[in-house]
Every structure is written in structure tokens, then in C-alpha cells.
């Protein structure tokens, strides 16, 4: 029978010298000095302790044990002669009387060294995730995730929100991404869907008489991976409030999030309430994005007028946006790499020139501007030494390309980017409608359940593209954490809103029957939001990949290489749910 441990591997101190102890953990490494002397590192969840083997017999025993086996060590604590003050246990060591193997590692070689697992190939890390997670630097992110989620729960409870779980098996609904479908065995030809979000359920809860709801909600979307988006599933701090306005939602978020970011984040400064509010159109005009990184103090300048008829082909008949960077001393190589990265991200080119210390326009496209130097300097407010980045295209394309250029220039200029803080902002006043890029027809811009500003009157009397919605995004350091809205709780306004995109009352009833019917029985005005838990933790940890903060993430191809999912299933399993596979033809 295994003797219970008396201490963990991060617990023993100099005051424990002379005590007899039992430690358990993973055999991490050994430094062999001679045939009867070796220094073994024992690691558990909490830390490491040095074990000093001083007998030939015990050295022979450990020679037959592979690294990463789990062992039990019983022995006596003593003071170390060569102390390591960087370790919590660095003043002591344990001299073993007995070593027992608890779980053998049967492999002589590991897929990667545990303490260097972050440098290994990502698919290897994910396949052997149980080894990767033994790396303290990897494990610490998952531990932090647990603490952050607990803190968020506590804060929501303190504010009077009820944690209510909503169904995982539900119906398919048009919410922007592809559904994961689950065949219903007892209902041939019918399917459940995993929820893309608890959107309808939380709104129905408000119509059911609940006042404040939240949950750490799992969401499932069949969409491609990105650095800040995990394919398949993710979690969000989902919340909804009855009889609430946009400002009520803002107040809750501004009370809940900054303390969590400051307490656990790699940066110890976060925006204080109230966060900056930026209308969508203003954000696009000033920053070239609806996800501005406000740590960067650069803004876009309209250069369309001063660049007109300059003879530079890409500018002819286009909107031109400029970004002026003072004190930008980057080399030509850096400038070229920034322009190349803009093209990779946007498929559009970026251009540039400088005003040198002598007041001359040099570099880049400067030869096209010599005849209007004074006008360019005046229009852009240039001073000697200023660098100017430019983009051109249709207005929205020029803005978006400039937004990418702004971010890259900011990151390359220490003077213009404060990197040691969390800068939150609200993007507000989104358009209710837009013209779809593919359809060419009127579509909802964001959330079809948003309340239009001006209500039914605006829908009946205003040009659709001019109507704004009570819709908002929460952004931190250039990352969109969440979208939210004041909901359209009035069936009449809802029908009218959908009519403008070509859907009638019967379509609404067919697509959203439960929510529509619930609202017909008297629903309160309500509003909500759902910050992404994974993205928040990614920012708090200072990680660039969201997969680093998820215990068992899929890879970029939406595959779980550890478990082997997705996988084929037995023919009988398909028969049980009345499904036949129709494979696409090979090209």
C-alpha cells in the first residue's frame, strides 16, 4: 500500500530539517555525480524538491526507472550545503530511505523535454497534451484560468446575478456561423444543434421573470481557427439584465473586469470606469477599425484632397488615408516589412514617404508629391523628421488597410505605444443594417435582435442604412472581447426590423418561435453582453495564441489530435440515427 504524502514538493523549508517525510511526484531529472551519489529532482503539481541519493544500491534502483515515472520518496529533510534561493525549497533537500515506483513511464525517450515543451511542434504538444501540461509554465496558465473563472463567478454573484445553465441540445438557428448538428435517434431526419450562444434562452429567461442572469456558457461554432479564436467550442461570461439600459450593462462590465485584469494580468494597470465610448463610424474614421488598440496614440488623417491628381496611379479616384508618425527612426528594411505585412493581412498595398530634417520630401512615393510639398506639409501638419504611411481604395477598404498599418506602425514605435496596460473601450452606435458583400442586399449589420435607435418610427421613416442600433462591442488592446445589445423585446418592432431585410412575420415565427411567442406575452426591456472567457484569459496571461490557455484545445484544423477527433464511427451507430454518408467526389 502506498504511504500517503506528508508534504507537497513546494512545501518543505529549513525549519523542517530533521523531519521524516514522504513526498510523491514525477521523477523529472537526475544529475549523477558518481555511482553512489546523485541529485534527483522530484516534481508535483506544487513545485520541486531535490532528493539526494547517497547509496550505490539506491542509485542502481533509480537507474532502472525512466524519467517521468511517478515515485514515492520517504526520507529525512536536511539543510542544503549549496542553497538555491530562487526555489521555494532551495534551502533543503531530502535524503531518501526508500523510493517506490508508483507509475512507470515505459518509454526511454520522451516526445519532447517537459520543461522545453513550448518550443516543440504544436501538433506534438497537443497529441501529448498530458506531457505538455506537466511543464509548469504551461500548467500555470490553466491554474490561472481556474482562478479567473472563480473570480468572475464571485463578482457576478455579488452583483445579484443568478447562475442559470441553459440547454446544450437545442434547435438550429441562424446566428452567423455553421451549427454543429446532432441527429435525433428517436426522430428520424431531425437534428438537435449545439448552441452557438445561449442568446434566445437568456432572453426568454428575462421574459420569464428573472432579473439578472449569468453563466460561464459553452458555445459551439463550426468556424475556422485564428490566433484569438479556437475552433469548435469556447466559453463566454454570458449575462442578461431585465429592465436595463445600455449604460446599466456598461456599469456591470466596468465594475467586474478591470479588477480581475489588474489582479491576475501581466500588466497591473487597466482602464478605470467609465471606459471610453467611441461611435462605430468615428472609430473607423480615426482608427481604421472597430477594434482599436488605444495603447497606440496614432490616428488616421484624410489625405484624399491633397493627394488628388498627384499622378500616382493607386491614388487616382480613391480615398487616401494617412498616418503621421513623428520620431519614427525605423530602417528601410523594417518599413518594407511593415508594408509587406499590410498586404498579407489586407490584400491591399501601403505606401510611405518622409519629411527629412531639411524639410524635404524623401523616400517612398515622394517624387509624386514634390510639386505640392507645401500643401502636403500643411494638410498633414508635418514637421521635419515625420514619417507618413498611406493607404488608398474605396473608403471602407482604405480605412481598414490604414487600421492594419496603424497597428503595425504603433508596435514598431515605442514612443507611440504603451504596452504595459489594458486599455478598454466601448464601440457604440453600430449601423442596424448594411449591404451584404456577397448578396448585395440589405442585411443586419450585427445582431438581428438589437433594438433600433428611434424604435419603430425610425424603421418606418428613415433610410435603413442610416438607422443606428443600441449595439455595442467591448474592446481591449485591439481585441474584441464581446458584442452586446439592448434587445428588441417588442414583437411589432421585431417584425418591422425583419421586414426590411425581406423576412415577414411568418418567417420570424418560424425561425424564432419560442422567443417571439414569449415576447407576445409581455417582455421587459432587457440588455446583455457576453465577454469571451478564453480571449480575456489570453489577454490577462499575455499570450498571443488562445490555445495556450485552453486545457485541451483543438489544432488549427479543428482536430483533437490527442483523442483522435473527429473520427469515423461504426456503421451500426449511423444506422441507429438513420444517417448515410455521402462522400464528396474526389477532384
Task: List where the protein language model places each region.
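Class II aminoacyl-tRNA synthetase catalytic cores and aaRS-like
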Residues: 1-587
Amino acid at each position: 500500500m502506498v504511504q500517503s504524502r506528508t508534504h507537497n514538493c513546494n512545501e518543505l523549508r529549513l525549519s523542517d530539517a530533521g523531519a521524516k517525510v514522504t513526498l510523491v511526484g514525477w521523477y523529472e531529472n537526475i544529475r549523477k555525480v558518481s555511482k553512489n551519489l546523485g541529485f534527483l529532482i522530484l516534481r508535483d503539481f506544487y513545485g520541486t524538491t531535490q532528493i539526494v541519493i547517497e547509496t550505490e544500491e539506491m542509485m542502481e534502483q533509480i537507474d532502472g526507472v525512466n524519467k517521468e515515472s511517478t515515485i514515492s520518496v520517504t526520507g529525512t529533510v536536511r539543510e542544503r550545503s549549496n542553497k538555491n534561493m530562487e526555489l521555494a525549497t532551495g534551502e533543503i533537500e531530502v535524503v531518501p530511505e526508500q523510493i517506490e515506483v508508483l507509475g512507470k513511464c515505459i518509454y526511454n525517450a520522451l516526445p519532447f523535454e517537459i520543461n522545453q515543451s513550448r518550443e516543440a511542434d504544436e501538433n506534438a504538444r497537443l497529441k501529448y497534451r498530458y506531457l505538455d501540461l506537466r511543464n509548469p509554465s504551461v500548467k500555470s496558465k490553466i491554474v490561472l484560468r481556474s482562478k479567473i473563472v472563480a473570480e468572475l463567478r464571485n463578482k457576478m454573484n455579488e452583483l445579484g446575478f443568478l447562475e442559470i445553465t441553459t440547454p446544450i441540445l437545442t434547435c438550429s438557428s441562424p446566428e452567423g456561423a455553421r451549427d454543429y448538428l446532432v441527429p435525433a435517434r428517436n426522430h428520424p431526419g431531425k437534428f438537435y444543434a449545439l448552441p452557438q450562444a445561449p442568446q434566445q434562452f437568456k432572453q426568454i429567461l428575462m421574459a420569464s421573470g428573472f432579473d439578472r442572469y449569468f453563466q460561464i456558457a459553452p458555445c459551439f461554432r463550426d468556424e475556422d481557427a485564428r490566433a484569438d479564436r479556437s475552433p469548435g467550442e469556447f466559453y463566454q461570461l454570458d449575462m442578461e439584465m431585465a429592465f436595463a439600459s445600455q449604460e446599466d450593462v456598461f456599469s456591470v462590465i466596468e465594475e467586474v473586469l478591470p479588477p480581475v485584469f489588474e489582479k491576475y494580468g501581466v500588466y497591473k494597470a487597466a482602464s478605470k470606469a467609465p471606459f471610453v465610448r467611441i461611435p462605430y463610424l468615428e472609430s473607423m474614421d480615426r482608427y481604421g477599425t472597430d477594434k482599436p488598440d488605444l495603447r497606440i496614440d496614432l490616428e488616421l488623417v484624410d489625405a484624399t484632397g491633397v493627394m488628388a491628381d498627384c499622378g500616382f496611379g493607386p491614388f487616382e479616384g480613391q480615398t487616401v488615408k494617412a498616418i503621421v508618425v513623428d520620431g519614427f527612426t525605423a530602417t528601410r528594411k523594417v518599413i518594407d516589412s511593415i508594408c509587406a505585412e499590410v498586404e498579407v493581412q489586407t490584400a491591399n498595398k501601403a505606401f510611405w514617404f518622409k519629411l527629412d530634417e531639411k524639410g524635404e520630401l524623401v523616400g517612398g512615393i515622394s517624387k509624386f508629391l514634390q510639386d505640392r510639398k507645401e500643401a502636403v506639409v500643411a494638410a498633414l501638419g508635418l514637421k521635419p523628421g515625420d514619417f507618413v504611411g498611406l493607404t488608398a481604395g474605396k473608403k471602407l477598404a482604405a480605412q481598414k488597410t490604414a487600421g492594419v498599418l496603424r497597428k503595425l506602425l504603433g508596435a514598431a514605435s515605442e514612443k507611440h505605444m504603451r504596452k504595459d496596460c489594458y486599455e478598454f473601450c466601448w464601440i457604440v452606435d453600430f449601423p442596424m443594417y448594411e449591404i451584404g458583400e456577397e448578396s448585395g442586399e440589405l442585411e443586419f449589420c450585427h445582431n438581428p435582435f438589437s433594438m433600433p435607435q428611434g424604435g419603430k418610427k425610425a424603421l418606418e421613416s428613415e433610410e435603413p442604412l442610416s438607422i443606428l442600433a443600441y449595439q455595442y462591442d467591448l474592446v481591449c488592446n485591439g481585441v474584441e472581447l464581446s458584442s452586446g445589445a439592448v434587445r428588441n423585446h417588442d414583437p411589432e418592432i421585431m417584425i418591422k426590423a425583419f421586414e426590411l431585410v425581406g423576412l415577414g412575420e411568418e418567417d420570424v415565427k418560424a425561425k424564432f418561435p419560442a422567443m417571439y411567442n414569449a415576447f407576445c406575452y409581455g417582455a421587459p426591456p432587457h440588455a446583455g453582453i457576453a465577454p469571451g472567457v478564453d480571449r480575456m484569459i489570453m489577454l490577462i496571461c499575455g499570450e498571443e495564441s488562445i490555445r495556450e490557455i485552453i486545457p485541451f484545445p483543438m489544432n488549427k484544423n479543428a482536430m483533437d489530435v490527442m483523442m483522435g477527433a473527429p473520427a469515423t464511427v461504426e456503421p451500426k451507430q449511423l444506422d441507429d440515427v438513420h444517417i448515410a454518408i455521402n462522400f464528396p467526389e474526389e477532384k
